[in-house]
Amino acid sequence: MKPTPLPPISASAPDKTNGVSAPPPRQSSATSKVFASIRHALRRLWSVMTANRKVMAGSVIVSIFILVAVFGPIIIRQNPFAYTKDLVQPPSSAHWLGTNQGGQDVFVQLIVGTRSSVMWALITGLMVMVISVAVGLVGGYLGGVVDDALSVITNVFLVVPAFPLAVVAVEYFNRSSITIAIVVALTNWPWGARVLRAQTLSMRSREFVTASRAVGEKTWRIIFLEILPNEIAIVAASFITTTIQVLLAVAALEFLGFGDNRAISWGTMLYDAQTGSALFQVAWWWFAPPGLCIALLGAGLALLNFGIDEVADPRLRQLKRRVRRGKAVAA
Amino acid sequence: MRHVIRRIGIYLLAIWAAVTINFFLPRLAPGNPAEIVYDRLAQHGAVNPATLKALELEFGVNTTDPLWVQYISYLNNLIHGNLGVSTTFYPHNVTDIIGQDIKFTLVLLSVSVILSFTLGTLLGIVVAWKRGTALDTVLSSVMTFFYSILYPWLALMAVYFAFTIGWFPFSDGYDLSLTPGWNLDFLMSAAYHAFLPALTLIISTVAGWMLTMRNSMVTTLSEDYVLMAQAKGLRQRRIMFAYAARNAILPSVTGFAIALGTVVGGALLVEIVFSYPGIGYALFQAIQGQDYFLADGILLLIIVATVLMNLVVDVLYSVLDPRVRQERSA
């Protein structure tokens, strides 16, 4: 089963256009070509984003969260730690999502926390992808002893339960977001590495790889500039899955109190709610929103992923007509 | 046969890696367990430098032995089932504490994993069979949402509703006025207390099973042998289960092995939120009390148990998929 690679999303055209354009009116022509290629890339991105209902719903949800993460804290400009005298107040016009035990505004915390949660989920997801791409592609392409060694390591880490290991490991180091990110990255890479290795194995014997080897291209160039771009769809899909996983893992670790207590994120909000016994004060507005945000962002990412799967593998599409025709043939 | 030997080799390596990580982690950390117990004893008075020396000797820390000698003696202790002494529950052995807590975790985990796998797989089969209908759309969307729910948050919500409505207990593993034993009162109480933790575990894991099964089932349904079965005029239920589901379940079984680690992690969180007296809660208490021996012992147990379960799943897989036995698939 080989999913067909998606059309490349990134704009790679500008580099090429610079060299091709004619010298005299260089400035204007080059810029217009750059604009044209940017427009082309955006149209490409748009067509990928609107490929089907799932991808569209997913992109809308994820985009909203990213926009809030980038601009939210700038727009509301309030200190999430500021104490007020309104302790544990239900939602009102002054405090949209009420206040917590310290009288801190939950809505402000939620918006500021979005930045930390989204950012660290993406950073950690990226770290995981770098490890899995390196291990999977190098092992799959080189084969032999290197592959055997990397496969064994991958399989060993695949068997070891990630979360308990992360909990124990995090305990031994100082509490900061970067510690959590590193520990989560080190315990979550094997799945992606395994998928990418399998794909690289089948890629290795393709003609374009043989050709670049015959031309005498360097091994690292073949792996990362020839094979990797052809696996970008799988890399993207496993980046999304990984990001969901690490979003949950990071939040769970923060919920257990391993987070950085000078920063605010969805996970630390839940930790505060748990330790401040929000439950027994019936302060639902304190602990419900961060969890809902995590689930929504996760669902958005999952929708994006399932949608991409459907684009890549037409069999997963919900084509009623085709099924009926199948039955008609059967009958 | 080669496949089985290879897998067993990987499992042995995994256990060895876990043991080694377990050995090195506490030694990388600042402070040592002897000092922690010493400090705790010091609060009650009656200590002298000799006490610290004795504790260090007992815990085997801060010695002048080279690292490899410590490593060998650590392995030797492990083989004899000696995981050290708990510092939070001093002077109880780690092995005793684990032995006492593991029963709760085992029952809670096995019941909820089996229920969730069965339910999720059945739902996946039905939804794939009726794909494109309203049932599929609704269930798939709801499950996509459940799929990415933060487990402890779900548990918090459950505790919240249990607290406000007052239907189910939301802490402890049984009614503390009863003495644990094989009598009806205790078992009923334990089941009553386990209901909410099990329910939240099932809700948070059922989505994964359903979505895996649905995707794999949809792929299988477009196979020629399913068309053939339909052409033969076999009953729908027979095609659904004996033809499509029988072949579609393989990825779920593989997923089962991988999900075990996740489920164990979920159980850890469930026990913490519900203060459920299993090993997950014990691990949490151990970490909060900087009880390295107990934390490492529990981590080791969790890893070994997951590895063993993987082995079981491998055997099950080779029973379900004849191709594995004939070594045609990796």
Predicted feature residues:
Chain A
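Glycine-rich helix-loop "coupling/hinge" segments at transmembrane-helix boundaries
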Residues: 158, 169-172, 199-200, 241, ...
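Short membrane-interfacial helix/loop motifs at transmembrane-helix boundaries
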Residues: 32, 70-108
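Generic hydrophobic transmembrane alpha-helix motif, especially the helices
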Residues: 96, 100, 127-131, 140-206, ...
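Transmembrane alpha-helix signature in integral membrane proteins
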Residues: 106-141, 296-297
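C-terminal transmembrane helix and the adjacent membrane-cytosol boundary/short C-terminal tail
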Residues: 184-187, 233-241, 284-331
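N-terminal signal-anchor/first transmembrane alpha helix
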Residues: 30-81, 150-153, 231-232, 298, ...
